[in-house]
Swiss-Prot record:
Pathway: Pyrimidine metabolism; UMP biosynthesis via de novo pathway; UMP from orotate: step 2/2. Pfam families: OMPdecase. It is an enzyme of class 4 (lyase). PROSITE patterns: OMPDECASE. GO terms for molecular function: orotidine-5'-phosphate decarboxylase activity. This is Orotidine 5'-phosphate decarboxylase.
Length: 232
């Protein structure tokens, strides 16, 4: 498998294997990695990861595990056994849960995926947090959870690009994965806190998750190439 040097992760947010592979077959694994989320994984199970890896892609398994420490750690181990490049868990599961995942990966005898923490979903604003009992700005909650992730030894965080500068300043070791990326002129859809790819990298993001601007483009390969060119 050729190592991808691009920061772009294309979201394969599809309900079927056929639809996901139809897009993947138009993409160059040297120009992007791919993300398998809940819908596709639930539909296709682990086989979709194997197929994508056989096509040369590094896979971000975006299942956002959140359970008691042992259960979550065993799920992360199962992801590592699949050969995924990156896996994520919810930071709100707490320090012990994240630390258990870290310890399990350290003991894993094989390539270790990047272990990424999910802070605050990019669709959530202050009123959404208030609705679940958190009277706090999203950025404050992100910083609170980031400190737990750092303490637990996580490799990085999922965060919006607006949070990236503060996170890089406070936790320069952590790699930042940013969804809600829309090239200039794209619709915002359901991601509220968004920036363009260039703005996100300049803000401190390390990896950019891009879905509909590529997957729904008339020519996905051309759309991907245009973003790569924009990033220089």
């Amino acid at each position: 498998m050729s190592a991808c040097q691009s920061p772009i992760i294309v979201a394969l947010d599809f309900p079927t294997r056929e639809a996901a592979l139809a897009l993947a077959d138009q993409l160059d694994p040297k120009l992007c990695r791919v993300k398998v989320g809940k819908e596709l994984f639930t539909s296709c199970a682990a086989g979709i990861v194997e197929i994508l890896r056989d096509k040369g892609f590094e896979v971000f398994l975006d299942l956002k595990f959140h359970d008691i420490p042992n259960t979550t750690a065993m799920a992360v181990k199962a992801a590592a056994e699949m050969g995924v490049w990156m896996v994520n868990v919810h930071c709100s599961g707490g320090l012990r849960m994240m630390a258990a995942c870290r310890e399990t990966l350290e003991a894993f005898n094989g390539p270790k995926p990047l272990l990424i923490g999910v802070t605050v979903l990019t669709s959530m604003e202050r009123e959404d947090l208030a609705g679940i009992g958190l009277d706090i700005e999203p950025q404050e909650q992100v910083l609170r959870l980031a400190a737990l992730a750092e303490k637990a030894g996580m490799d990085g965080l999922v965060c919006s690009a607006q949070e990236a500068p503060a996170l890089k300043g406070a936790h320069p070791r952590l790699q930042l994965v940013t969804p809600g990326i829309r090239p200039a002129g794209s619709a915002q859809d359901d991601q509220r806190r968004i920036l363009t790819p260039r703005q996100a990298l300049d803000a401190g993001s390390d990896y950019l998750v891009i879905g509909r601007p590529i997957s729904q483009a008339a020519d996905p390969a051309k759309a991907l190439a245009a973003i790569v060119a924009e990033l220089g």
